[in-house]
Swiss-Prot record:
Annotated Pfam families: Mab-21, Mab-21_C
Any one GO cellular component localisation term in the record: cytoplasm
Free-text tissue specificity from the UniProt record: Expressed in the adult cerebellum and eye, with lower levels in the adult forebrain. In embryos at 10.5 days post-coitum strongly expressed in the rostral and distal regions of the developing neural retina, with no expression immediately adjacent to the closing optic fissure. Expression is also observed in the dorsal and ventral aspects of the developing forelimb bud and in the developing pharyngeal arches, as well as in the midbrain.
Name listed for the protein in its UniProt record: Protein mab-21-like 2
Similarity section: Belongs to the mab-21 family.
Length: 359
């Protein structure tokens, strides 16, 4: 048993060195290329409208606010200033979303975003995005990369296609620190020892983002009140939870396997599903020793089996917001074929670790 475990860990480490590192290097190269173009477009936006200040900056070879969706798809979060005159209202009526309401006694004119406030006093995510979309469209025509970048039409999101190969979504957002959403109040679960009080305090202090984008739960049926809502996002908090042990290595292997074998019609699975299931695995295995290098194979198998179970039940709850289903709106047939393909992959890895050489 231990010999089989050791063999799997050896093969996974080899896979990580050969496949995952190559994937990372290729993505890093793409990011540099993409960020040059995006920075140029955002510089042009800022000239037209100084309220939209580019927050895309490189820190320790990482771009702050950039999320890799897949090797050809990225999201850049553009942080906006001055959320201060608004209250964060999160009553759970829209899973995964919240609204920003003008604080009592505050005048509209005190806000930097006065023309985007609705008659009922809400700061409209949709109105801000619509204005930003117009500015980006103009900037694309003027910027020095105009020959290689185009706006993607037929969406309310701000999406650019670069060199006909890459898609970048630019999302206006507010950073919320020092508060924690009511819809995530059940975290951490009282009976689960992970991640421990110190880490919990760090994560809650880190806060979350409010993004101006289409809500998961509302796709295709947005009323105007709902489309004024902002989407909750916990990227930094999640990254902090995944520090230590072989967690990030495990995530890297999962992402590489997904890119190579689970990129299926209907796009049932993305890397965020992998990250979410890894967080649940951390709860199931709360001891740090469970995340030693020697346990990499066990953890990976656990996550793949959990993924199959979620695909078969057609439900994958968000880690912090369990009322939000990350499979919402995905075609059942796509989830079914993803379950079969994941099962084939898991069986292959478990019964014949050497197959990783070909995966």
């Amino acid at each position: 048993m231990i010999a089989a475990q050791a063999k799997l860990v050896y093969q996974l480490n080899k896979y990580y060195t050969e496949r995952c590192q190559a994937r990372k290097a290729a993505i890093a190269k793409t990011i540099r290329e993409v960020c040059k173009v995006v920075s140029d477009v955002l510089k042009e936006v800022e000239v037209q409208e100084p309220r939209f200040i580019s927050s895309l900056s490189e820190i320790d070879a990482r771009y702050e606010g950039l999320e890799v969706i897949s090797p050809t798809e990225f999201e850049v979060v553009l942080y906006l200033n001055q959320m201060g005159v608004f209250n964060f209202v999160d009553d759970g009526s829209l899973p995964g979303c919240a609204v920003l309401k003008l604080s009592d006694g505050r005048k509209r004119s005190m806000s930097l975003w006065v023309e985007f406030i609705t008659a009922s006093g809400y700061l409209s995510a949709r109105k801000i995005r619509s204005r930003f979309q117009t500015l980006v469209a103009q900037a694309v025509d003027k910027c020095s990369y105009r020959d290689v970048v185009k706006m993607i039409a037929d969406t309310s999101e701000v999406k650019l296609r670069i060199r006909e190969r890459y898609v970048v979504q630019i999302t206006p957002a507010f950073k919320c620190t020092g508060i924690w959403p009511r819809s995530a109040a059940q975290w951490p679960m009282p009976h689960i020892p992970w991640p421990g009080p110190n880490r919990v305090a760090e994560v809650k202090a880190e806060g979350f983002n409010l993004l101006s984008k289409e809500c998961y739960s509302l796709t295709g049926k947005q009323s105007s009140a709902e489309s004024d809502a902002w989407v909750l996002q916990f990227g930094e908090a999640e990254n902090r939870l995944l520090m230590g042990g072989c967690r990030n290595k495990c995530l890297s292997v999962l992402k590489t396997l997904r890119d190579r074998h689970l990129e299926l019609p209907g796009q049932p699975l993305n890397n965020y599903h992998m990250k979410t299931l890894l967080l649940y695995e951390c709860e199931k295995h709360p001891r740090e020793t469970d995340w030693d290098e020697a346990c990499l194979g066990d953890r990976l198998n656990g996550i793949l089996l959990q993924l199959i179970s979620c695909l078969q039940c057609r439900r994958c709850p968000h880690y912090f917001l369990p009322n939000l289903d990350l499979f919402q709106g995905k075609p059942h047939s796509a989830l079914e074929s993803a379950a079969k393909q994941t099962w084939r992959l898991a069986r292959e890895i478990l019964t014949n670790p050497k197959s990783l050489d070909k995966l």
